[in-house]
Amino acid sequence: MKRLHLFAFASLMAVSGSVFAAAPVLNVRESVTVHASPDVVWGKIRDFDGVSAWHPAVAKDQIIAGSNNMVGAERMLTLRNGGTVTEKLLAYDARHRRYRYAIRMGVLPVSDYVATISVKAAGLNRSKVTWTGTFKRKHVAANPPANADDATATKTMVGVYRAGLDNLKKIIEAP
């Protein structure tokens, strides 16, 4: 009888574990080469509250806590579709031209999101901008509904990164 109870308990734990299994950590890494010096490119993206100047999906950004480019600052992005995303600056390194931030809340289908954007030299008067992020899908069920799965979260973030990087290149390289 004791074995039967242990078996039932183990079976229940296995089933409940699969229903509430932790979503895997997902990664996105996108980059673009821009025909401009790293200082010029960094000048365009360096302000934590300046995303709307180069990302086409962001209509407005504003600091809602702390000070621009200071660790701990929070910004609210208002997207062109009306949605909002609140982000917190985790690290800022002007010397190495990079910053790291986390999404605190918002309309994107991700959770536990942390990203870094950086600019490095890529030859004479050329720069490589790299945007990397780690995150989980927002929906926590082991079998999420369609459009709430890992593929949707990854595809969304690739789209966000590509739109921003491609527009940044276009703006900087425009005659």
Predicted features along the sequence, with ranges:
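Stable alpha-helical elements in mature extracytoplasmic
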Residues: 37-38, 44-50, 85, 153, ...
